[in-house]
């Protein structure tokens, strides 16, 4: 009996996630950014796909002076709190897998000091970032469980 309830719970969660995804409108600029220009809509590991999609923008940003790069990252964090909150609210789900703006910004922070021509370091940064994002070591796990809304999405 428990197995059936568990299967039903999984089916209900999957159905709810699909309903939430249908509430997205890529014509809405907040939704477009929150989904990483649509990369978060990947049916296969959207966080990983979103992290990969952040790399071309990082490459362009990597040629900026460090001060301007840092300013763009800080603005992206501030804007991200709002756009992730609004998109999650519109979807009716907190931190839906398709919301990957936090992965974009996290990758930009991870790769900030890496020269654009050091692709082995970019690959290593990607792997470390994804491992930490999936594992969520303390204190990130605490924030993930206790901080809600756009701030919770961005900080995890």
Task: Cite the ranges covered by each PLM segment.
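Interhelical loop and helix-boundary elements at the membrane-water interface
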Residues: 2-52, 82-109, 131-155
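Hydrophobic alpha-helical transmembrane segments
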Residues: 33, 48-53, 67-74, 100, ...
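Short helix-loop boundary/capping segments at the starts of domains
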Residues: 39, 58, 62-66, 80, ...
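Alpha-helical transmembrane segments of multi-pass membrane proteins
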Residues: 58, 73-82, 106, 111-112, ...
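Helix-coil boundary and interhelical linker segments in multi-pass alpha-helical membrane proteins
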Residues: 58-71, 110-122
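Hydrophobic, well-ordered secondary-structure segments
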Residues: 70-77, 81-90, 116-118, 125, ...
């Amino acid at each position: 009996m428990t197995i059936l309830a568990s299967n039903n719970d999984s089916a209900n969660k999957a159905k709810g996630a699909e309903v939430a995804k249908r509430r997205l409108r890529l014509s809405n600029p907040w939704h477009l950014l929150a989904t990483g220009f649509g990369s978060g809509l990947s049916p296969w590991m959207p966080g990983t796909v979103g992290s990969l999609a952040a790399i071309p923008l990082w490459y362009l940003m990597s040629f900026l002076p460090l001060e301007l790069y840092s300013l763009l990252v800080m603005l992206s964090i501030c804007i991200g709190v709002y756009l992730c909150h609004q998109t999650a609210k519109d979807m009716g789900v907190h931190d839906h897998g398709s919301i990957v703006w936090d992965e974009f910004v996290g990758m930009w922070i991870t790769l900030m000091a890496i020269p654009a021509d050091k692709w082995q370091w970019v690959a290593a940064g990607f792997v470390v970032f994804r491992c930490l994002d999936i594992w969520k070591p303390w204190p990130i796990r605490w924030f993930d469980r206790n901080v809600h809304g756009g701030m919770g999405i961005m900080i995890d």
